[in-house]
Amino acid sequence: QGEVCMDNIILRCDNNINGIFTAIYDAFVYKNQMQKENHEVYRDNISIEIGIGGNYSLFSKMIDIETDEIKVQKTILTIQKKLGFKIYETVFDALCHYSDNRATIVLGFLVRAFKVGQRIMEHMTDKYVMEVFELSRKVNKEADKIRGFIRFSDNGNYLLAHFEPKCDMIPVVMWHFVDRYPGENFVIYDDRRRHAVVHPRLKECFYINEREFKQLERSVPVKTDSFEQLWKVYFEHTDIRERFNPQCQRNLCPKWYRKNMVEFT
């Protein structure tokens, strides 16, 4: 990894789960190296910056991190083995939040968790512990909505769903739809982050980027889904006009989800 001579280190990683897990792995390498060289207690002086850009500091060492699948798997297995699957899920969900500080928060959480083990759940007064659980809670709250709001259309070759979640929802909700539609070809595209997950019938899922998704769209003839119109008619004719409450509807189904819900288009 090279010598570390600065008091503060900023690790800059790719803007995805694997990039962050790689940075977390390297953060612990640097942390252990700094403690060995300086014989001091770690002071949370390593942070993780996600994606390009960000603020530079004259008093920090900026290190670019290249995503490494081996480091990703080692990090995941270590968390699961030492802290348990429940805490791993909490960490994973927190990393799917949109906060720019989510990786640094999770790093601070893991530094503390590896010291006390699963008893970290009892340390809710700690800033990092509290923030990780809060990020995870918000991600799960949105995931509950997404599972109900996502809409698939059938183009004759596969089912396609578009959505624009605030958090990175594909890693969180895709297994719900894999379990629900194991025998279907389907694609879920995140218009905000411009990537998609593809589920071939009875096979493993994989990710594609925006360019690959556009190629997939062009390769399939446009076909109207007749059930879309039937669903619109059903939606419009099953409501009770006397009980129409737009404010309540907005609370239960916020407007930013409706763009990709066929009954509102």
Pin down the residues of each PLM region.
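Short, hydrophobic/amphipathic alpha-helical patches that form generic packing surfaces
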Residues: 19-30, 107-109, 172-179, 229-236
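Long, compositionally biased intrinsically disordered terminal regions
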Residues: 185, 196-197, 216-265
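Glycine- and acidic
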Residues: 6-11, 159, 213-216
